[in-house]
Amino acid sequence: FIQPLDSFRPSKTMPVVIYLHGNSSSREEGMQYVPLLLKHNINAFIFDFAGSGLSEGEYISLGYNEKDDLEIVINFLSNQPGVGRIGVWGRSMGAATAMMYIYKDNRIKASIIDSAFGDFKVLAKQLCKKVKNVPEFLVDVVYYFVKGSIKDRCKLDLDTLRPVDYAKLCQ
């Protein structure tokens, strides 16, 4: 949680932006934005999702379980003195996380959704198409087996990773 010293605070309460990093990244990704936020009298809360950076955990879930991390952070910030309005800034996986969570929490007053994927299955197929000479039926077969393996290991159905379904619920 990054905020100015009391002697530099323009008011007792200040808004805070929670930065949500992307896949294969960590809280370090968001540190570059701290000077910008503080310049505009906005506190910053930057953390590692479970399974990323210095956090415990073995796997990331591209937003599915990370939305639980976001809820914990919002609950924490809501009880901190000096915290005003709460905003969320997500990039890539962090943006997908935000989309899958913010619709149900009216404590979030603003959001920046940067480069979220809309549907994991569509994204996976698009990425596989970049590999030359791989027939589409083979992509479907591999996706089927990978999906089963992830469901067994992580209890996550990849077909439910569709942040686009939550976009229409956000206001």
Give the residues covered by each predicted segment.
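The serine-hydrolase catalytic nucleophile loop
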Residues: 14, 18, 23-36, 49
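Alpha/beta-hydrolase active-site loop
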Residues: 29, 60-81
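Alpha/beta-hydrolase fold nucleophile elbow
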Residues: 80-92
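Short beta-strand/loop motif that positions the catalytic acidic residue
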Residues: 169-171
